[in-house]
C-alpha cells in the first residue's frame, strides 16, 4: 500500500465523488443530465455519452485535489481514457485524486429485510486487474430496509468477507451497507448495524484496512467512534435519496464523516450548458459538499 496515497485518504480534507452509475442506473443519470433515451440506440452509444459526461466533470477546473480526495468509478470508466491517459492515472497524476472501483454486480432480492449483493464472479481477476490499473480502493453496496438482526448480520458478514479478500489483494475496500432512508425503522437499523460493524472490526486481521460508506445516521455522530478506529481509513456518507441541500445539512452535523455523493454531485449539471455554466454549477456544488465534509 502506497503510504502517500493512504495518508492522503486518511488525513486530508475533502470528499469522495461517486461517478459509478452502472448499466442499470445509467439511463437515469443521463436523463438527469438532459440526455434522453432517444439520444442513443444501443449500449455502446449510451456508455460513450456517459463517459463524455464523466470526462466533463473530471476535467472541470473545480474537480481538484483541494476539494476532492477520491472518485469512485464504474468498471467501464476504468477501462477508458481521459485526455489520452487511463482514467485512474489521469485522476491521480493530473489531479491527485484517488481512484476507486465499484466491484459489486447489483443487489439480490429482498430477504430478511435486506438486500445482499449478488455473487461477484471473477472477483480475484477483477482485483488483480484493478491493481494493474493503479486503482486505490473498491466499493460495494448492500441495502438494509428493516431492523432485522439476522438480515443485518448477513449484510455485514458478506461485506467483510469480500472486504478481507479485497484488502488482501492490496486495495482499500469501501464497505457500504446502506440503510434505506425511507425505512420506518431507520434509527433501529442503524443501532443494529453499528453493533455488527463493531463486532466485525474486532476480528478484522490487524494488518488490513477498510473504509465505511454509510447512510447519514438519524442519531447524530452515531458512527463517530469509527472515524477514530486505527483500521478504518475513513468514514464516508452516501446521500441516499436526500436532496443535495438536505444531505449537506445532515452531514455537517456528523463529526469526522465526509461525503461520497453521486446523484447529489451531478444535480444541476446539463449537457446543454456552456462550459462556463457547467463549471460554475460544478464549482458551487463541490464547494457545498466540501464544506459539509470538513465539519
UniProtKB/Swiss-Prot annotation:
Pathway: Carbohydrate degradation; glycolysis; D-glyceraldehyde 3-phosphate and glycerone phosphate from D-glucose: step 4/4. CDD domains: FBP_aldolase_I_bact. It is an enzyme of class 4 (lyase). Gene3D superfamilies: Aldolase class I. InterPro entries: Aldolase_TIM (IPR013785), FBA_I (IPR000741), FBA_I_Gram+-type (IPR023014). It catalyses: beta-D-fructose 1,6-bisphosphate = D-glyceraldehyde 3-phosphate + dihydroxyacetone phosphate. The keyword Lyase applies. GO terms for molecular function: fructose-bisphosphate aldolase activity. One of its GO terms (biological process) is glycolytic process. SUPFAM superfamilies: Aldolase. The keyword Lyase applies. Belongs to the class I fructose-bisphosphate aldolase family. This is Fructose-bisphosphate aldolase class 1. It comes from Treponema denticola (strain ATCC 35405 / DSM 14222 / CIP 103919 / JCM 8153 / KCTC 15104). The gene is fda.
